[in-house]
Amino acid sequence: MKKMTITLGPRNYPITISSGLLNHFDSFEPLKKGDQGMLVTNQTLAPLYLSSIRTVLEQGGVRLDHIILPDGEKYKSLASIELIFTELLKKWHGRHTTLIAFGGGVIGDLTGFAAACYQRGIRYIQIPTTLLAQVDASIGGKTAVNHQLGKNMIGAFYQPASVIIDIDCLSHLPLRHFSSGLAEAIKYGIAFDFDFFCWLEANMDSLLRRDVDALSHCISRCCQIKSKIVMEDERDENGLRALLNLGHTYAHAIETETNYIFYLHGEAVSIGMLMAAQTAQKLGLFSKTDIIRIKKLLLRAKLPIQGFHQIDPKSCLLHMMHDKKVMNDKLRLIIPTAIGQSEIYEGIDNDIVLASIKETLM
């Protein structure tokens, strides 16, 4: 078992990483006997896990209700938030209840945002079941839903009471979704940690076999990197946390342009990181050799390195102008300057960005 703590002034919460955590009531901290909870999950996971989780929690003395939502990014919406609120009110959940997010990034975002809003804020627990959520989305307190004009446009900073990462949940994850999570792990290597990037190169085959030791190291290293950044820049105020968005401005534009249907988030991030690297190369900040190295690792992770559904580059650029990091009508992009290093660049010529999008999509 690996455990770390995120400390934010007087607030702190644990992240626990191991196999078999869902089998033990003590794993579900800070729940205790007599508590009331509402588990939020989706139609894919409910048949696999709902009954066993209910048994563990009810044997521990928790009064548990649940809501099952449709599965998919297109359901990360205000309509789904309304469904959660309605269920909480119908089942008489007050300010001392606990929401439990059991799912991937969509469920985590929905549950966290609902917790931030319901009766002006209630406790919630993150139990991420996808690799993407385990290495990234469940940590740091960013919660949001999408709008038709942009991804993650409506949300709040709201930290969970704990994060419970059971590696066994990955056994049911389809390969495409598993690879989507690997994109976020690779992002940490490109943006922050050259040694971790090298480790990913050396251990990609073990990760794809879902070797428990390799997964444990990968997840814990990603959590360590993100935890450190969140503790230094919780609300994205000094620019450090923004570096976690390497490739994401491009990726969110791809997802918005394709209506969240054709690309998983990690697939869009994979393409977006290459767009960022191409932009950096055009600015003389990044080598072609390193772009080739990144492409090779992404391909080994079964990730796309170019568009596989028709995308209009000019529309992508327009969507990018809606990004939350835009200031004074100027794009602010996270650009790699070497493998393991990244910086924020403002005011990059739109023609350079557009050319990078076109080249990567070809």
From Swiss-Prot:
GO MF annotation list: 3-dehydroquinate synthase activity; metal ion binding; nucleotide binding
An annotated GO cellular component: cytoplasm
Broad class of enzyme this protein falls into: lyase
Location(s) in or outside the cell: Cytoplasm
Cofactor: Co(2+); Zn(2+); NAD(+)
Residue sites binding NAD(+) per the record: 71-76, 105-109, 129-130, 142, 151
EC number(s) on file: 4.2.3.4
Catalytic activity: 7-phospho-2-dehydro-3-deoxy-D-arabino-heptonate = 3-dehydroquinate + phosphate
SUPFAM superfamilies: Dehydroquinate synthase-like
Pathway where this protein functions: Metabolic intermediate biosynthesis; chorismate biosynthesis; chorismate from D-erythrose 4-phosphate and phosphoenolpyruvate: step 2/7
Keyword line: Amino-acid biosynthesis, Aromatic amino acid biosynthesis, Cobalt, Cytoplasm, Lyase, Metal-binding, NAD, Nucleotide-binding, Zinc
Entry-linked Pfam families: DHQ_synthase, DHQS_C
Family assignment from sequence similarity: Belongs to the sugar phosphate cyclases superfamily. Dehydroquinate synthase family.
PANTHER family in alphabetical order: 3-DEHYDROQUINATE SYNTHASE, 3-DEHYDROQUINATE SYNTHASE, CHLOROPLASTIC
Family annotation (NCBIfam families): aroB
The protein's role, per its UniProt record: Catalyzes the conversion of 3-deoxy-D-arabino-heptulosonate 7-phosphate (DAHP) to dehydroquinate (DHQ).
The name this protein goes by in its record: 3-dehydroquinate synthase
